[in-house]
Amino acid sequence: MNSLSIFFIVVATAAVCLLFIQGYSIYENYGNIKEFNATHAAFEYSKSIGGTPALDRRVQDVNDTISDVKQKWRCVTYPGNGFVSASVFGFQAEVGPNNTRSIRKFNTMQQCIDFTFSDVINIDIYNPCVAPNINNAECQFLKSVL
């Protein structure tokens, strides 16, 4: 064995030892790690002190770049007609003939989630709270879920 191979053996042994030490440290503190994660889970998607939003980068969705809670899209139960996707901007819309817009309704919560948080950018929005219909039932419902 020459000195170069001995050097690489020492470096590899040190690296393996560090991995074992890290693994043992996680094993010893696993209860504390779970407690910390449970305590701070509510802040997972909140805005950080630095001003940049804390994002879940595993899945891209429409709420990733929004830090205001009212602007985030959510699926809510619509009275008597299934589920709708809503935010402060309005509802996800269906565009009908003559460019008329109506609320897009879904039969199940899963259909609403799949449509709202899909990779497709859904830009059709219907806001019932713009003049002259400020006091209609759809606007009151939108305000109640925000």
Curated annotation (Swiss-Prot):
Q: Which family does it belong to?
A: Belongs to the orthopoxvirus OPG155 protein family.
Q: What is the gene name? A: OPG155
Q: Which residues lie on this side of the membrane: Virion surface?
A: 22-146
**Gene Ontology cellular-component terms listed:** membrane; viral envelope; virion membrane
The UniProt transmembrane annotation reads 1-21
Annotated protein name in UniProt: Envelope protein OPG155
Job of this protein: Envelope protein required for virus entry into host cell and for cell-cell fusion (syncytium formation).
Coiled coil located at which positions? none
Query: What is the species of this protein?
Result: Cowpox virus (strain Brighton Red) (CPV)
PTM comment for this protein? Answer: Contains two intramolecular disulfide bonds. They are created by the viral disulfide bond formation pathway, a poxvirus-specific pathway that operates on the cytoplasmic side of the MV membranes.
Q: What is its main location?
A: virion
